[in-house]
A protein has these predicted regions:
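Domain-level signal for soluble alpha/beta catalytic cores
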Residues: 1-315
Length: 315
């Protein structure tokens, strides 16, 4: 029987997966269409993407349910299939491991709107949408729930509460930070800095604090965020940085950091104390494969160092 996710990361850091949205588009999803619905209509294509991540070495696969709340799915007239879509997302991610041990992290992204008094949704409506989604993910066997790409503490807190109410065995809260133009610091779109976010998530009952996406959040800035989390918080940290800085090419935003370039930051990320390392915008299975290689080299180096220290102590 495999250990719980929060127990496994105390043994050694785990490797997450990479971007899903861009991989879906490469597989044929048209811009503006509902990628989450592919869990039901094109499950073999979703499975093929996640299997490539698993084969690249991912220990954790995040479900294809980022926009899987009934509020988000309503934009595509799919709200009534929210439970079905989320359950299928877990089942597909589990299949990607091909029977080997691995962790499925159920994905809950932003609900896509604003709450009162600035928008049309009440906190109760958002909470119920997240609770329904989290419940479906947990019932299908997700090992953890991640509330990700959050910019406001209010929505993040509602998501954490909903996941806990649904009985999630592990709850991950993940903020998206934007780097300032001079690169000196970063905050969420709503002005939340890493220290405030980490303290909030720990107090709210998250099991793991995380960061993902955000403008300019490359490996180095993500490493800084990990260090800032760990300076004020006792919880494990997960990071999913982007593949470099965004660039505008032919009126499209692209991330052009190669797998080898991005993987050069793995050692520093591990030294900063990250417990789960994945990747976000612009990343591919090849990036994750490069991460796996660097992480395995790190673990082997640690093993040899430990053996040498033990031998010296016995002389």
């Amino acid at each position: 029987m495999k250990p719980r996710l929060q127990d496994a990361i105390h043994t050694r850091p785990l490797l997450g997966d990479g971007a899903m949205g861009t991989q879906l588009m490469l597989a044929g999803l048209e811009q503006g269409n509902c990628g989450e619905a592919w869990n039901l209509t094109q499950p073999e294509r979703v499975l093929a993407i996640q299997r490539r991540y698993a084969e690249a070495g991912s220990d954790c696969i995040i479900t294809n349910t980022f926009g899987g709340s009934c509020i988000m799915l309503n934009r595509h007239s799919q709200a009534g299939r929210a439970v079905e879509i989320n359950r299928a997302g877990v089942e597909i991610a589990r299949q990607a491991f091909g029977g080997r041990p691995g962790y499925v992290i159920g994905d809950i992204g932003p609900f896509g709107g604003l709450m009162e008094p600035y928008g049309d949704f009440t906190a109760a409506q958002v909470r119920e949408a997240f609770r329904e989604q989290a419940g479906a993910l947990v019932d299908a066997g997700a090992d953890a729930i991640i509330i990700e790409t959050q910019t406001s503490l209010e929505e993040l807190g509602i998501g954490i509460d909903a996941a806990r109410e649904a009985g999630a065995p592990c709850v991950i809260g993940s903020m998206a930070y934007d780097v300032t133009l001079d690169g000196s610091t970063f905050r969420s779109m709503m002005g939340v800095d890493p220290e405030r976010a980490a303290k909030f998530m720990e107090e709210r009952g998250a099991n793991i604090v995380a960061l993902n996406c955000g403008t300019g959040m490359d490996m180095e800035h993500a490493r800084q965020a990990v260090a800032r989390y760990r300076a004020v918080c006792t919880l494990p940290v997960m990071a999913q940085p982007n593949a470099g800085q965004p660039k505008l090419v032919d009126m499209k935003v692209v991330y052009d950091e190669t797998p080898e370039q991005m993987a050069r930051g793995v050692e520093a990320m591990l030294a900063a104390g990250v417990s789960i390392l994945g990747a976000c915008c612009g990343s591919t299975p090849e990036h994750i494969r490069a991460f796996r290689s660097r992480m395995d080299e790190h673990f082997e180096s640690q093993r040899r160092r430990s053996e040498l220290e033990h031998e010296n102590q016995t002389l």
